[in-house]
């Protein structure tokens, strides 16, 4: 139980980092392939 507060405080930090990585990847993919978000691939 000693590591539980550290784990709970680490969760929001990891969430923010993961969402930042996902947003950055989505922006980069949208810059390289701008039509993928609006039209199907077929």
UniProtKB/Swiss-Prot annotation:
UniProt superkingdom: Bacteria
Gene this chain is encoded by: psaJ
Subcellular localization, as worded in the UniProt entry: Cellular thylakoid membrane
Family per record: Belongs to the PsaJ family.
Alphabetical list of HAMAP family matching this protein: PSI_PsaJ
Organism of origin: Gloeothece citriformis (strain PCC 7424) (Cyanothece sp. (strain PCC 7424))
Keyword line: Membrane, Photosynthesis, Photosystem I, Thylakoid, Transmembrane, Transmembrane helix
Membrane topology of the entry: Single-pass membrane protein
A GO CC term assigned to this protein in UniProt: plasma membrane-derived thylakoid membrane
Function: May help in the organization of the PsaE and PsaF subunits.
Main location: membrane
SUPFAM superfamilies documented for this protein: Subunit IX of photosystem I reaction centre, PsaJ
Protein name: Photosystem I reaction center subunit IX
GO BP annotations listed: photosynthesis
TM annotation in the entry: 7-27
Pfam families referenced in this protein's UniProt entry, alphabetically: PSI_PsaJ
Matches recorded under InterPro entries: PSI_PsaJ (IPR002615), PSI_PsaJ_sf (IPR036062)
Gene3D superfamilies (UniProt xref): Single helix bin
């Amino acid at each position: 139980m000693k590591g539980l507060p550290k784990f709970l405080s680490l969760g929001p930090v990891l969430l923010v980092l993961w969402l930042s990585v996902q947003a950055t990847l989505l922006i980069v993919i949208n810059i390289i392939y701008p039509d993928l978000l609006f039209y199907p691939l077929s």
